[in-house]
Amino acid sequence: MPNVNRNGYDEYLKQHIPGAIFFDLDKNSDAKTDLPHMLPEASIWEEILSNLGISNDDRIIIYDNSDVLSSCRCWYNFLYFGHDPNLVGVLDGGLKKWILENKVVNSNKIKIQKSKYKSQENKNLVKNKNQIDLNINIKDFFVVDARSKERFEGKVPDPRKNVRSGSIPNSFCLPFKEILNEDNTFKKTEEISKKFIQIIDIKHNNIVFSCGSGVTACVLALAYSLVNNKYSPKIYYGSWAEYGKI
């Protein structure tokens, strides 16, 4: 994320939930583009998960040590590449809540036995810039932006270089922090529903989430799936880093 000077791997080595393996969102994104956090090719994803010892039938619980941002994006990546949605979840509140509840952490090294992971891309879960542009007029789907209202309305400079301020025409704004509690757990489904009802019909399944670089959009996508169990998360993965590029 822009303006964040942290080393996730160092934090992981210092303490983690017993048995947890480390996943680097930045390093495991597409290295062939200058856009941040773009999805890797399917063959690269297979290599990444195989090297981590993850199998297709594994139950995956994802957590992070931030505002659930990385864990929600990782959750989305697993779904995009075909992991069973019933086998992928996010630890509510992440490591911070885990530690506050005095649960066990350690710094033990994890021995990994390589697997042979096979991906199956679901390209219906992503939108590209051309599809976003076409939708401005035909309005086939709603675009909901997870950034702050100040960034959405162009009242503050974008934190990334060579990216203008503003938002996608005809999109809606729901800052992702509005569906989280102060401890970074998700609000109750009734409260989440109220937030979405203010801008869209929560029975609508054709919702595409956007943000700065395709990360916080996944927080909203997960939240929306909690109040609409028929929804499959859809992301404009280039997000404003691509759309607002100068």
Regions found by a protein language model. Give the residues of each.
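Cytosolic catalytic domains that perform sulfur/thiol-centered chemistry
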Residues: M1-I246
